[in-house]
Amino acid sequence: MSSSVASTENIVENMLHPKTTEIYFSLNNGVRIPALGLGTANPHEKLAETKQAVKAAIKAGYRHIDTAWAYETEPFVGEAIKELLEDGSIKREDLFITTKVWPVLWDEVDRSLNESLKALGLEYVDLLLQHWPLCFEKIKDPKGISGLVKTPVDDSGKTMYAADGDYLETYKQLEKIYLDPNDHRVRAIGVSNFSIEYLERLIKECRVKPTVNQVETHPHLPQMELRKFCFMHDILLTAYSPLGSHGAPNLKIPLVKKLAEKYNVTGNDLLISYHIRQGTIVIPRSLNPVRISSSIEFASLTKDELQELNDFGEKYPVRFIDEPFAAILPEFTGNGPNLDNLKY
C-alpha cells in the first residue's frame, strides 16, 4: 500500500472515532485543506437548492465547498456563505472554497476568477483549478454564462476547440496570479482531469506545481497509476463523483455494502472513508440536507480492505463522467460510461 495511506493512518490513529469533517490534509504549499468537501455540480433545474445544501453542510461541520464557474451554482454558494457569516455561524477564514476555470475562458483566467469572486461575494478563493486541459472556441450567446456558449459545438455536434489553444496557457495564467505578491485572490492553484502525460508536461514547463488534481475516482475507477504519480510529485488527488454519478451506483457494489455493515456506517460513509483513508480529498455531491449531515462517520478501513476495493475497480473499471468534449483526452472516450462493467 502506498505511503499516502500510511500518512493518513497517522492522522486517524491520533483521533478517537473521528468525523470525516475533522480530518485535514496539507497542500504542497502548506495550506491546510479539509479532506471532505461538498460538491455543487448540481442539475440545472435544481441550482437554487444549492444554497440550502451548502448551509446544511456547513452547519453539519463541513468546511470545504467545491464549485465552479461552469456549474452556475456560485451565486447560491455565495448567498449561503453570506448568511452564515452574518449570523455568526462561521468565519471566512474557517472555510475552504474551491472554484474552477472552464475551457471557454482558457485564455482569460483573470476574467474567470473575477466573475467567480463576484458571484460568490468573496474577496478570495482558497483554491483555483483549471477545470479541464482543453481550450474551447468562444461563441457569443446572450443567454449563456457571461454571454458565452459554455461548450460550443458545430452543426454536426462536434466540440469546437480553439485553433490556437494550448491548455498550459491556462495554467500559466493561474500561476501568474498566484505568484504575484500583490494579488491575494487565490491561496493555492491546481488542475482537474489531468492525466499523467499532461501533468508531466506541466511540471516540466511551469514554475508552480499543482497542489491538487481533481479527477473522477472511486471503487469502480481507482486510478492507481495516477494516484502513485501524484503522490510521488506531492500533488493531492481530489475525488469527484465518489458515489458514481446519478443514482449513486457505487452504493450497490456488494463489497461496499459488506464493509459498510462491518463498520456500522452508511454506504456514503464507506465510500467517503475509502478516499480519505488513502490520503485523497473527496467531494460528494448532494442536495439532501439529511444525507449531507449524516454522511460524516469515518470507517477506518484496513490496508487489505482498501486493496480489495482497488482490485475490484482494476478488474471492472467504469468512468461515469465521460463527456463528448473530453474524447480527445487520454483515458476518455467521449461515449459515456461502460455500464457492462457495473457489478452488483
Curated annotation (Swiss-Prot):
Q: What is its EC number?
A: 1.1.1.117
Catalyzed reactions = D-arabinose + NADP(+) = D-arabinono-1,4-lactone + NADPH + H(+); D-arabinose + NAD(+) = D-arabinono-1,4-lactone + NADH + H(+)
Q: Which residues carry this modification: Phosphothreonine?
A: 151
Entry keyword NAD: yes
For this protein, the record's CDD domains field holds:
AKR_AKR3C1
Gene3D superfamilies xref list: NADP-dependent oxidoreductase domain
The alphabetical list of record keywords is:
Cytoplasm, NAD, Oxidoreductase, Phosphoprotein
PROSITE patterns reported in the protein's UniProt record = ALDOKETO_REDUCTASE_1, ALDOKETO_REDUCTASE_2, ALDOKETO_REDUCTASE_3
**SUPFAM superfamilies named in the record:** NAD(P)-linked oxidoreductase
Q: Give the matching InterPro entries.
A: AKR, AKR3C1, Aldo/ket_reductase_CS, NADP_OxRdtase_dom, NADP_OxRdtase_dom_sf
Tell me what the record says about temperature and activity: Optimum temperature is about 30 degrees Celsius.
Which Pfam families does the UniProt entry name for this protein?
Aldo_ket_red (PF00248)
Q: Under the cellular component aspect of Gene Ontology, which terms does the record hold?
A: cytosol
**pH dependence, record text:** Optimum pH is 10.0.
GO MF annotations, alphabetized: aldose reductase (NADPH) activity; D-arabinose 1-dehydrogenase (NAD+) activity; D-arabinose 1-dehydrogenase (NADP+) activity; D-arabinose 1-dehydrogenase [NAD(P)+] activity; diacetyl reductase ((S)-acetoin forming) (NAD+) activity
Q: Where in the cell does this protein reside?
A: Cytoplasm
Q: Some GO term, biological process aspect, for this entry: which one? A: acetoin metabolic process
Q: Relate the protein's function as given in its record.
A: Catalyzes the oxidation of D-arabinose, L-xylose, L-fucose and L-galactose in the presence of NADP(+).
Q: How does it assemble?
A: Heterodimer of a heavy chain and a light chain.
Q: Which family does it belong to?
A: Belongs to the aldo/keto reductase family.
> Further remark, if any?
Present with 30200 molecules/cell in log phase SD medium.
Q: What is this protein called?
A: D-arabinose dehydrogenase [NAD(P)+] heavy chain
Q: What is the lineage of its organism?
A: Eukaryota, Fungi, Dikarya, Ascomycota, Saccharomycotina
